[in-house]
UniProtKB/Swiss-Prot annotation:
Coiled coil: none annotated. Keywords: Metal-binding, Repeat, Zinc, Zinc-finger. It comes from Encephalitozoon cuniculi (strain GB-M1). PROSITE patterns: ZINC_FINGER_C2H2_1, ZINC_FINGER_C2H2_2. InterPro entries: Znf_C2H2_sf, Znf_C2H2_type. It comes from the Eukaryota. GO terms for cellular component: chromatin; PcG protein complex; transcription regulator complex. One of its GO terms (molecular function) is RNA polymerase II cis-regulatory region sequence-specific DNA binding. This is Zinc finger C2H2 protein ECU08_0560. Gene3D superfamilies: Classic Zinc Finger. A zinc finger (C2H2-type) spans 219-243, 249-273.
Length: 295
């Protein structure tokens, strides 16, 4: 299926349901504005989504949270069921799925509200649901809340680990609240004379080399004093994966367990899954009996 860029959450779900392959038990879906593929199941006339795919789906519509948070919320509200027909494939308990009929814009708001209330009060209300604490810091740039005065500054390692799920819109909200350690608002780039007091003396040369100014390269890696600075937040996110070894971009092709740190590498990998009968036999494995088009 082609991707549906620009649609709202419920409209996207309806589009997926309307284009499920007739007579197919499994259909391929491309998530909006991404190269990520998921597979939906059609059982007794209903279209079912894998619960574990929900975190990727919601991320496309602005709700970012851990998979465990989203799955637990869906289970607690009784929206999850077991797909008994696939016990042979997914074990005795079957596959946890969510029916497309429960997906709505209201559900999107419910999940976002649940995540915010679980994390605590917000200070940066216009920055997004992930900013749930009044003080955040990226790299050695300290972000304080206006309500806390000059003493409300902390380094990110003192409060939270690096969060690779922050989006650009969230970061824009953070950058609007930048303050130096003396309480002055950070609007201009740092210079040798007026550099922020919180920049360590030993790292000033490296900071100036990589960043030039806070405005030009405000996103700094703090992993083991790496201090690489980047102009765009997504570049910092991608760089951080080299330190953590994380591979968030997983191949959704049934039977394939490959994962990659970069989405472009995943897109390149998808080319190995050709549409020949030989590749279907090798890659789809036990999925073959589910859909006549796979044989």
């Amino acid at each position: 299926m082609k991707q549906d860029a620009g649609l709202g959450f419920r409209l996207w779900v309806e589009s997926v349901v309307s284009r499920v392959l007739p007579g197919a038990d499994v259909s391929e879906v491309l998530l909006p504005d991404t190269a990520t593929k998921i597979y939906v199941f059609c059982v007794d006339g209903r279209v079912l989504f894998n619960l574990s795919d929900l975190v990727d789906i919601l991320k496309c519509f602005g709700v970012c949270a851990d998979s465990s948070q989203i799955c637990e919320y869906m289970r607690s509200t009784g929206r999850v069921e077991r797909l008994e027909q696939l016990k042979d494939l997914f074990g005795e308990e079957g596959l946890e799925v969510v029916c497309s009929s429960v997906f709505s814009d209201k559900l999107l708001q419910e999940i976002g509200s649940s995540i915010r209330s679980a994390k605590g009060p917000e200070c940066f209300k216009d920055a997004g649901p992930e900013l749930s604490h009044p003080r955040f810091s990226i790299g050695e740039y300290k972000f304080g809340c206006q309500r806390e005065g000059r003493d409300g500054f902390h380094n990110v390692n003192e409060l939270y680990p690096f969060n690779h799920q922050w989006t650009d819109s969230i970061m824009d909200g953070i950058l609007k609240n930048i303050y130096t350690s003396d309480g002055k608002r950070m609007e201009d780039g740092c210079t040798g004379k007026e550099r922020p007091a919180f920049i360590k003396a030993g790292s000033r040369g490296r900071h100036m080399k990589h960043s030039g100014s806070l405005k030009d390269r405000p996103f700094v890696c703090t992993y083991n004093d790496c201090k690489r600075a980047f102009k765009r937040y997504e570049h910092l996110k991608r760089h951080n994966l080299m330190h953590t070894g994380e591979r968030p971009h997983k191949c959704r092709f049934p039977g394939c367990s490959k994962a990659f740190s970069r989405s472009d590498n995943l897109s390149q990998h998808y080319k190995v899954h050709s549409t020949t009968n030989e590749m279907h036999t090798r890659s789809y494995g036990s999925y073959r009996y589910l859909n006549k088009e796979f044989n």
